[in-house]
Amino acid sequence: VEYACRDDFGGNLDEVSAWAGLHYFASRTGEAANAERDTVLTWPQGNGKLVELLAEGLADLRVNAMAFGVEVTNGTPRVKAIDAHGEAFEIEARAVLLCLPRFVARRLLDPAKASPDLVYSPWVVTNLTLDELPPSPGVLPAWDNVVFGSDTLGYVNATHQSLASVPQATVITHYETLCGQPPAKLREWMLTQTHAQWCSRAIDALAAPHPNLREHVTQADVWLWGHGMIRPTPGFIWGKTREAMQSATPPVFHAHSDMSGMALFEEAFTRGERVAAELRAWLG
């Protein structure tokens, strides 16, 4: 359970809402009518496939631009943005939907209307390119591999489904969520560590199943997610802060798993459906 709380909520048992843990694990007993319980639904593009499907229904889509401000004047929202060439522009709309975590959204909005600070868990993701995945004692490597007794979250093997009969180059992705101290303090500490230190940290964490892993590493890429996922801290799920986040504030609307307090795809999907209904009702 400790591992699952770090993996799904970004915190230790004492840092996570008991209700969130019970709700999440109680909801994982469903079984498909046409598949085994351990069947995984994936696409070669990953979640990019879902983005492509969602984009198909949009008639006027402008990409490669970044919004940096949202202002509402006399009831009319305007989005300030900048394109890939550095040119600034504005979009005037009847309504604006921000599908963003609140720590980002609050930087686009009037500070007086922004959400209060929420608790976000820092994550570190390390991609190790290997000339081959070295053998390990015990069971054969799976797609998602957890190291017993480790504080990290294990690794994912990119070529797990390969049908190759001989060892081949691969990429394994090592995940670690930092917890046990205030997130702000952990973010400060993250920035003091060098690339070499992060690489060694990941390799050392996988030394138990792969003692000679370091000999097979040809490249290492590290990414620090300072606000990797919202953490459902004790009291947050049924507290006034999250309750206030549910209220629509036309003409600016929000849709994100932050509003549920759990960084899960199912929660994000639900928030998208709900805000679509709110938008339709408000726009008439």
Indicate residue ranges for each PLM-predicted region.
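Conserved flavin/dinucleotide-binding core of flavoenzymes
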Residues: 135-284
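Residue-level signal for well-ordered alpha-helical scaffold segments within enzymatic catalytic domains
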Residues: 3, 49, 53-56, 107, ...
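Active-site/ligand-binding neighborhood in enzyme catalytic cores
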Residues: 1-69
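Mid-domain catalytic core of redox enzymes
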Residues: 63-172, 176, 209
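Aromatic-acidic/polar surface patches that form glycan- and anion
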Residues: 39-47, 89-91, 117-119, 191-199, ...
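Short loop/turn motifs at secondary-structure junctions
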Residues: 57, 92, 213-216
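Short, internal active-site loops enriched in acidic
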Residues: 8-12, 68, 73-75, 222-230
